[in-house]
């Protein structure tokens, strides 16, 4: 049997020989083409050798010339002898060649070595950072009890989805890019695509849940946070994963059975139904465009609400040097000024307020009017003292840095004023005005005069007070009623004046007490609001960073998906980059936590520096010392 080398030798010895065609005078192709074809078939595949077992018929088949030439001519489809008794099996050779091409693909996918090294290095670094970052989030949630909040449960679910992407999706897609073809079969392809799309969409759904949680926590802090439990958070997380699974997994795994055939080639891996425009648009809208629209709207509302809270807090923390008015707020929320407590502060320095103290308030009372009539001086002095004492009582019960009483403290007034046993206060819709106080004082003086009690005495000679002008006013002492008395000391040389608590209406005392409690708790309320606002700002910053990263990384791919539905005009390199950008979002999320959340940042640092064991040891040592101290104290106490 002649080998293929012998055939090529005989071919080269007769290179100039041509076979005349008795019917069409067709020139046979050069010997070079025929030799290359025969050599490839017989050298690369032993299964093709039986085709040439009858070498004599293959080499010299008829009288027109060497049979090899005849067979070579028929092999390229250009010569067919009518006297041929055997035909060369052309279809078998072509099938063999196609199988050879499938099994001898370039393992580097046509890439140069340096390109493969660069791709593997970059994608490997990104995958490693993704895995480490999301593992840090999960471990931080485990070791730090302060991170076990409802909001962080959503971040934990997001980290799990991103970890799946880093471990499975990134590495398989990198292998697919480098090799240039899919080498793991159809089943592995469908499973990879299912895990990839479900985890990616779960990441999106978790971001959507976090956005809703932040929005309701800020806009409905009382009603929503009472219902915001760990169990409800688990239900919402479960729904996010279930929706993602239902949206992608069945369609990816069973679409070939729905349509009755699989159109994805064996050496490629992509979603089969992406060629259907309606389904592609539907999944793109449900998986990306609708969630990103909702998240953008929610974030805008969160931003506006946070800005509004910031302005309110700035109003609560307004400087005492600014002109402000102490206001009581009606329970319906409408602001209503009360003249007896309307302490119209002038824009003066604190030193001026300390200098004049009560006199400053006495001079700025609206109800006080200078009276030069000597006959009415005592009565006017009594009225003026009434008003001035009201202001002085308020000044004694609060610091000089009082702030406006806004809606946050109206509940305190309601509680204090609605004490049992005071029907007059319960039935009143507003606190007594200065006119009411004046009338009460007038009636009290009149009743005292009728009962022939002692008349009010002059306390001191008139004293001049300088505050933008000269005022001269004398003070009178109100009649003393039976009961406990208080002593109010006037500053700047004004002598002590003794008055009774019964001289003022009971409602005024309760109003003063209400203001005292309100101002005392005001700093605590402001502090709590400030801390709450800081937390809301941090949460909004974290959400904004995550949302921004999500939009940047996911938009290119989802645009290419829609474009690819109508035309196959997206370059393969651009498609791979867009696909990888979606993966990078899973890398960015843990970085957003670390940059925007101090608690996560400190826990990351503790874990990376291996300080967790040291912290536990210090805690154990502290507990042991405390135990020793406790046991030492017991015998002493027993003795």
UniProtKB/Swiss-Prot annotation:
This protein's GO CC annotations: plasma membrane; postsynaptic membrane
Expression sites by tissue: Brain, heart atria, and ventricle.
Cytoplasmic topological segments: 140-152, 213-232, 301-542, 597-639
Pfam family, one: 7tm_1
Subcellular location: Cell membrane; Postsynaptic cell membrane
Single biological process term from Gene Ontology: saliva secretion
Disulfide bonds: 189-269
Annotated glycan sites: 16, 44-45, 54, 97, 101
Transmembrane segments: 116-139, 153-173, 191-212, 233-255, 278-300, 543-563, 577-596
Low complexity bias spans: 382-393
Listed GO MF terms: G protein-coupled acetylcholine receptor activity; G protein-coupled receptor activity
Keywords: Cell membrane, Disulfide bond, G-protein coupled receptor, Glycoprotein, Membrane, Phosphoprotein, Postsynaptic cell membrane, Receptor, Synapse, Transducer, Transmembrane, Transmembrane helix
Region (Disordered), start-end ranges: 370-404, 431-471
SUPFAM superfamilies: Family A G protein-coupled receptor-like
Mode of membrane association: Multi-pass membrane protein
Compositional bias per record (Basic and acidic residues), positions renumbered to this chain: 443-454
InterPro entries: GPCR_Rhodpsn, GPCR_Rhodpsn_7TM, Musac_Ach_M3_rcpt, Musac_Ach_rcpt
Function text: The muscarinic acetylcholine receptor mediates various cellular responses, including inhibition of adenylate cyclase, breakdown of phosphoinositides and modulation of potassium channels through the action of G proteins. Primary transducing effect is Pi turnover.
Family stated for the protein in its record: Belongs to the G-protein coupled receptor 1 family. Muscarinic acetylcholine receptor subfamily. CHRM3 sub-subfamily.
Protein name: Muscarinic acetylcholine receptor M3
């Amino acid at each position: 049997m002649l080998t293929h080398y012998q055939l090529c030798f005989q071919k080269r010895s007769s290179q100039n020989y041509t076979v005349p065609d008795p019917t069409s005078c067709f020139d046979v192709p050069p010997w070079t083409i025929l030799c290359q074809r025969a050599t490839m078939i017989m050298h690369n595949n032993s299964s093709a050798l039986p085709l040439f077992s009858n070498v004599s018929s293959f080499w010299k088949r008829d009288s027109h010339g060497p049979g090899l030439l005849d067979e070579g001519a028929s092999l390229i489809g250009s010569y067919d002898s009518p006297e041929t008794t055997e035909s060369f099996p052309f279809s078998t050779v072509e099938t063999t060649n196609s199988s050879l091409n499938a099994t001898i693909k370039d393992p580097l996918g046509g890439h140069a070595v340096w390109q493969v090294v660069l791709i593997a290095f970059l994608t490997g670094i990104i995958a490693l950072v993704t895995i480490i970052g999301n593992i840090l989030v999960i471990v931080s949630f485990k070791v730090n009890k302060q991170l076990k909040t409802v909001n962080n449960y959503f971040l934990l679910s997001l980290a799990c989805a991103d970890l799946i992407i880093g471990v499975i999706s990134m590495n398989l897609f990198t292998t697919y890019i480098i090799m240039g073809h899919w080498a793991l079969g159809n089943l592995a392809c469908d499973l990879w695509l299912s895990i990839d799309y479900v985890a990616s969409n779960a990441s999106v759904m978790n971001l959507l849940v976090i956005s809703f949680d932040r929005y309701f926590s800020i806009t409905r802090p009382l009603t929503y946070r009472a219902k915001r439990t760990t169990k409800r958070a688990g239900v919402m997380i479960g729904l996010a994963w279930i929706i993602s699974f239902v949206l992608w997994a069945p369609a990816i795994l069973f679409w070939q059975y729905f349509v009755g055939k699989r159109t994805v080639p064996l050496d490629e891996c992509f979603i089969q139904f992406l060629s259907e425009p309606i389904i592609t648009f539907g999944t793109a809208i449900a998986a990306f465009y609708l969630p990103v629209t909702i998240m953008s709207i929610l974030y805008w509302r969160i931003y506006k609400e946070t800005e509004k809270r910031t302005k309110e807090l700035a109003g609560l923390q307004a400087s005492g040097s600014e002109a402000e008015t102490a206001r009581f707020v009606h329970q319906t929320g409408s602001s209503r000024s009360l003249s007896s407590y309307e302490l119209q502060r002038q824009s003066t320095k604190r030193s001026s307020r300390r200098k004049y103290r009560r006199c400053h308030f006495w001079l700025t009372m609206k109800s006080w009017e200078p009276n030069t009539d000597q006959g009415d001086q005592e009565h006017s002095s009594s009225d003026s003292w009434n008003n001035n004492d009201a202001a002085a009582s308020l000044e004694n019960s609060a610091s000089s840095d009082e702030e406006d009483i806004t809606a946050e403290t109206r509940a305190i007034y309601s509680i204090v004023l609605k004490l049992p046993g005071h029907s007059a206060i319960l039935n009143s819709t507003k606190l007594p005005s200065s006119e009411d106080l004046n009338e009460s004082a007038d009636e009290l003086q009149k009743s005292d005069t009728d009962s022939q009690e002692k008349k009010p005495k002059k306390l001191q000679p008139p004293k001049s007070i300088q505050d933008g002008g000269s005022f001269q006013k004398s003070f009178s002492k109100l009649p003393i009623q039976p009961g406990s008395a208080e002593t109010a000391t006037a500053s700047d040389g004004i002598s002590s004046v003794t008055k009774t608590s019964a001289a003022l209406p009971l409602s005024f005392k309760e109003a003063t007490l209400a203001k005292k409690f309100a101002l005392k708790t005001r700093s605590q309320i402001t502090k709590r609001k400030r801390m709450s606002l800081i937390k809301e700002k941090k949460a909004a910053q974290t959400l904004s960073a995550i949302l921004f990263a999500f939009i940047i990384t996911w938009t290119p791919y989802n645009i290419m998906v829609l474009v690819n539905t109508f035309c196959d005009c997206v370059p393969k390199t651009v498609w791979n980059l867009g696909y990888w950008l979606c993966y990078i979002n899973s890398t960015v999320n843990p970085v957003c936590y670390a940059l925007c959340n101090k608690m996560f940042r400190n826990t990351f640092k503790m874990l990376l520096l291996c300080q967790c064991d040291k912290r536990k040891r210090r805690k154990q040592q502290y507990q042991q010392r405390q135990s020793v101290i406790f046991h030492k104290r017991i015998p002493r106490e027993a003795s």
